């Protein structure tokens, strides 16, 4: 029996990595168990994204009856901090600490910001809606408090994710860094899928008290996940601290950014990232209200749409990793992702004519698949275009442009929806903005081709 057990263990050790995406990211210095524990911060980020873009988007528009334009602007507020992601990553690279820590202080501050935003958010949203006990409250109090809560969560999410990815890159051997970053984003999508399913189950029967429990529970979970991720992860290096205090001054952010943007096709690459992300982002604020108002889907059913998007993105990310590891052009991969988005949004629009939830869900998953191909392609291209000493800055630049464009798309999607609703019926107002996403993706298709050849 002992012999059979040894044979089974050896067999699993040999075959297992074939079925574990990014298993090659682990090393002797960074085993898979430690790497997965570090990736817990991505789970908290994915949970926040589901709440902001998915669950609260639907709840604010349908249940709380907040105008879609206000909802779009509120959801886009966290992305005001997106342009600072490159600066945050640069500051954590050059941070001077008596303990020699560079990443931990920034991740902890980001965690506190995220926790504080979630703590006050449910009460701010109820005041914003003006329902029940908040019926007599001044409107500006609800708008201001909701805006502050969204801003706090946004600042925390961007800080935690940017510096967390930099910490993961620090801990991994250089040859494994791309796979480690890929694993981090896979864990982000896993966190989104699990969170979307749980939120959908908990909000099956919606009422204000349950909304408060869910959002404040997310605040507690954020603190727990990030503390687990940080615990004994970054070593205290007093020698490095002394060297930074006594050594030559670090280059300024302007100098470092100038060096990065002078790289081959760097500016063109950032434009491609922005246009493609804008195309996919235009639909984010519309998916769940579309399902609720056009197809009469429940809160739980529309919340699970976020899991469908994340699932499609996860498949796209895994497929892109497999193809790119064989030497395929990353910008060509990004171009194919934009092309996949064209029929995806057409299918979503056509589902209203058929009044078919399965068609709608299929189109949503297809859009997520295209977004996964596009994101992985642009991320890989960004990392390959960066100098060896600026991989962290390159990751920050990629995240800054992508998040800023996503926020612009979310805000424009809500504004377009309300503008079309003035002249059209409720069904057509929910359908027409998807054509805007299709047009933006079509413009982006020409960009990656020129970037790849330029």
Swiss-Prot record:
Signal peptide start and end residues: none
Cross-referenced InterPro entries: MFS_trans_sf, PucC, PucC-rel
UniProt keywords, alphabetically: Antenna complex, Cell membrane, Membrane, Transmembrane, Transmembrane helix
SUPFAM superfamilies tied to this protein: MFS general substrate transporter (SSF103473)
Gene Ontology terms: cellular component: light-harvesting complex; plasma membrane
Pfam entry (one): PUCC
Membrane-crossing residue ranges in chain numbering: 35-55, 70-90, 110-130, 140-160, 180-200, 211-231, 270-290, 299-319, 330-350, 359-379, 391-411
Membrane topology type: Multi-pass membrane protein
Keyword Membrane attached: yes
CDD domains: MFS_BCD_PucC-like
Annotated compartments: Cell membrane
Family affiliation: Belongs to the PucC family.
Function statement: PucC is required for high-level transcription of the puc operon.
Protein name stated in the entry: Protein PucC
Organism: Rhodovulum sulfidophilum (Rhodobacter sulfidophilus)
Gene, per the UniProt record: pucC
